[in-house]
């Protein structure tokens, strides 16, 4: 099925037209010294700029909607998009208005006062409980109010651009329902993300290596099941590797283990023994703390008193050897607690192996989420990878073969 693109909309002409853009601006935000907002990783804001800039530059009246965190359907000053709006304005090189509400009197007044090329950012869409409601009627009611901001009282004069790939797996008012009311288009970011994932699923060059990390097997069971049948190698690290080690009957000490998933991991190991690669050694510590004393131990000899917080150097070498031969690589999830410098070497080592493979011609995709955060936290070059996704959960669900509501609704 065809999806209309941002270029299609620009070709139709947007000068003087209201355009609602659903962006993904969910960035890590903390307040320093009480009131000074600090965005530690502006990657998603940066990725949102090209679509917004193209529309504003073509004379559209651009209204951006996005979420930040999980405010549980009510206003939370610490989750206001005001600091994000300031950062967006700096990147765009123009003033970005920030409404004091989602679809209330301030948003409506500001929308009515927009001139060609202006940009307005609505307040955190999740301040309105209807955004994430399971009730179709409630979501549709909010979607109508959003549509009216760009299309007037009838909501028919504007357009909708979906450019928040990180939320396209959610059936939410600003992602799905509003697209049923307005002419809809995929923004440049969403179109690029979908194209990359189609390469991973439809035209993968082999050998195909998948690297999965993170803490819980249950979070990635479906994608493990799916990719184990498609990949030539499935490298598993992070906290979830300990459930696999436990499934082999090995001692894991105080490491994170999902006991209810042990039998499932055993089945996976039996079925895909030639595909799955587990760590050979572990960086173990006394407790989950940045300054906890650590030692490198064999993966089959983790002491009862210790917990694994990273993969060891021999594991990095083994995984790097697998990756060095790959032509296609998908990575989702860190190999250890990269936020603690003492336990970041595994993630860094595997990431550098992916970069080296990319330099040799491999097509590499970082699957968003914590993996993308690790790339930036460890000061690794974004351009060392073929593509860094802005949507961890959306990427995984696409690779599982699930229908993504925010993509499905765009298809004509």
From Swiss-Prot:
Subcellular localization: Cytoplasm
InterPro entries associated with the record: Phosphoglycerate_kinase (IPR001576), Phosphoglycerate_kinase_CS (IPR015911), Phosphoglycerate_kinase_N (IPR015824), Phosphoglycerate_kinase_sf (IPR036043)
Binding, ATP: 220, 308, 339, 368-371
Pathway assigned in UniProt: Carbohydrate degradation; glycolysis; pyruvate from D-glyceraldehyde 3-phosphate: step 2/5
Primary site of residence: cytoplasm
Top-rank EC class of the record's enzyme: transferase
Residues bound to substrate: 24-26, 44, 67-70, 126, 170
Record's GO cellular component terms: cytosol
The enzyme's E.C. designation: 2.7.2.3
Alphabetical keyword list: ATP-binding, Cytoplasm, Glycolysis, Kinase, Nucleotide-binding, Transferase
Reactions listed under catalytic activity: (2R)-3-phosphoglycerate + ATP = (2R)-3-phospho-glyceroyl phosphate + ADP
CDD domains, alphabetized: Phosphoglycerate_kinase
GO molecular function: ADP binding; ATP binding; phosphoglycerate kinase activity
Lineage top rank: taxon: Bacteria
Subunit structure, as described in the record: Monomer.
Family stated for the protein in its record: Belongs to the phosphoglycerate kinase family.
Family matches, as PANTHER family: PHOSPHOGLYCERATE KINASE, PHOSPHOGLYCERATE KINASE 1, CHLOROPLASTIC-RELATED
The protein's name: Phosphoglycerate kinase
Organism: Mycobacteroides abscessus (strain ATCC 19977 / DSM 44196 / CCUG 20993 / CIP 104536 / JCM 13569 / NCTC 13031 / TMC 1543 / L948) (Mycobacterium abscessus)
Lineage: Bacteria, Bacillati, Actinomycetota, Actinomycetes, Mycobacteriales
């Amino acid at each position: 099925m065809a999806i209309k693109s941002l270029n299609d909309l620009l070709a139709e002409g947007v000068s003087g037209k209201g355009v609602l853009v659903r962006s993904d601006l969910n960035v890590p935000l903390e307040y320093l010294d009480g009131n000074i907002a600090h965005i530690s990783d502006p990657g998603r804001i940066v990725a949102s700029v090209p679509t917004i800039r193209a529309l504003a530059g073509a004379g559209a009246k651009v209204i951006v909607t996005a979420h930040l965190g999980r405010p549980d359907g009510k206003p939370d000053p610490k989750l206001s998009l005001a600091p994000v709006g300031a950062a967006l304005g700096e990147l765009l090189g123009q003033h970005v208005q920030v409404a004091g509400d989602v679809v209330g009197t301030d948003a409506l007044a500001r929308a009515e006062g927009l001139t060609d090329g202006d940009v307005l950012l609505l307040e955190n869409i999740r301040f309105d409980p209807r955004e994430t409601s399971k009730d179709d009627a409630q979501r549709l009611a909010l979607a109508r109010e959003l549509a009216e901001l760009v299309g007037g009282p009838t909501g028919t004069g504007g357009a909708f651009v979906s450019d928040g790939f990180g939320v396209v797996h959610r059936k939410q008012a600003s992602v799905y329902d509003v697209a049923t009311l307005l002419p809809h288009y995929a923004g440049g970011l969403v179109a690029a993300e979908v194209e990359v994932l189609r390469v991973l699923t439809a035209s993968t060059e082999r050998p195909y290596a998948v690297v999965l990390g993170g803490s819980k097997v249950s979070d990635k069971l479906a994608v493990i099941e799916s990719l184990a049948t498609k990949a030539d190698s499935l490298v598993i690290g992070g906290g979830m590797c300990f459930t696999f080690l436990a499934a082999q009957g090995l001692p894991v000490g105080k490491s994170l283990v999902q006991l209810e998933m042990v039998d499932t991991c055993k089945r996976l190991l039996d079925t895909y023994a030639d595909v799955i690669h587990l760590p050979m050694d572990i960086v173990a510590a006394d407790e989950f703390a940045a300054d906890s004393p650590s030692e490198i131990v064999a993966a089959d000899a983790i002491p009862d008193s210790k917990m694994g917080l990273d993969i060891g150097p021999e594991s990095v070498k083994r995984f790097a050897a697998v990756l060095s031969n790959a032509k296609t690589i998908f990575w989702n999830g860190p190999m250890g607690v990269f936020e603690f410098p003492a336990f970041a070497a595994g993630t860094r080592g595997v990431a550098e192996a992916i970069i080296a493979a990319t330099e040799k011609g491999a097509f590499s995709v970082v699957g968003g989420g914590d993996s993308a955060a690790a790339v930036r936290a460890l000061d690794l070059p974004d351009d060392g990878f073929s593509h860094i996704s802005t949507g961890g959960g959306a990427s995984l669900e696409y690779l599982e073969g699930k229908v993504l509501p925010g993509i499905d609704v765009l298809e004509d």
